[in-house]
Swiss-Prot record:
Gene Ontology molecular function: ATP binding; phosphoribosyl-ATP diphosphatase activity
Domain of life: Bacteria
Pathway info: Amino-acid biosynthesis; L-histidine biosynthesis; L-histidine from 5-phospho-alpha-D-ribose 1-diphosphate: step 2/9
Protein name: Phosphoribosyl-ATP pyrophosphatase
Record lineage: Bacteria, Pseudomonadati, Pseudomonadota, Gammaproteobacteria, Pseudomonadales
Organism, scientific name: Pseudomonas putida (strain GB-1)
Pfam family, one: PRA-PH
Length: 111
């Protein structure tokens, strides 16, 4: 896993045990999963809007910024659920060489 993701995962774990007023992330953890999911939803919408704007303007700085926020809040959510970013990377690695159609079909129950 990248050094950046490892460092971020470590910081997120540390923030779980910090006072809510000590950092933004600590305050999110203190407010609970629903607040974290609310933020994740907001960041998802902001990323979509930035992507639509970038399509026309060809200025990608906002979509990069918003995607970073989206990834960050996704990592906060995973951490709140006791999951490490490596689990997502492992899942992405598992999907290499697997057709998206085949993967989707494997998830659907047979009739």
């Amino acid at each position: 896993m990248s050094d950046t993701l490892n460092r971020l995962a470590e910081v997120l774990e540390e923030r779980k045990h910090a006072a809510p007023d000590s950092s933004y992330v600590a305050s999110l953890y203190h407010k609970g999963l629903n607040k974290i999911l609310e933020k994740l939803g907001e960041e998802s919408v902001e990323t979509i809007i930035a992507a639509k704007d970038a399509e026309h303007s060809k200025d990608y700085s906002d979509v990069i910024y918003e995607t970073a926020d989206l990834w960050f809040h996704s990592l906060v959510m995973l951490s709140a659920l006791g999951q490490h970013p490596q689990a997502v990377l492992d899942e992405l690695e598992r999907r290499f060489g697997l057709s998206g159609h085949d993967e989707k079909a494997a998830r659907q129950p047979s009739a």
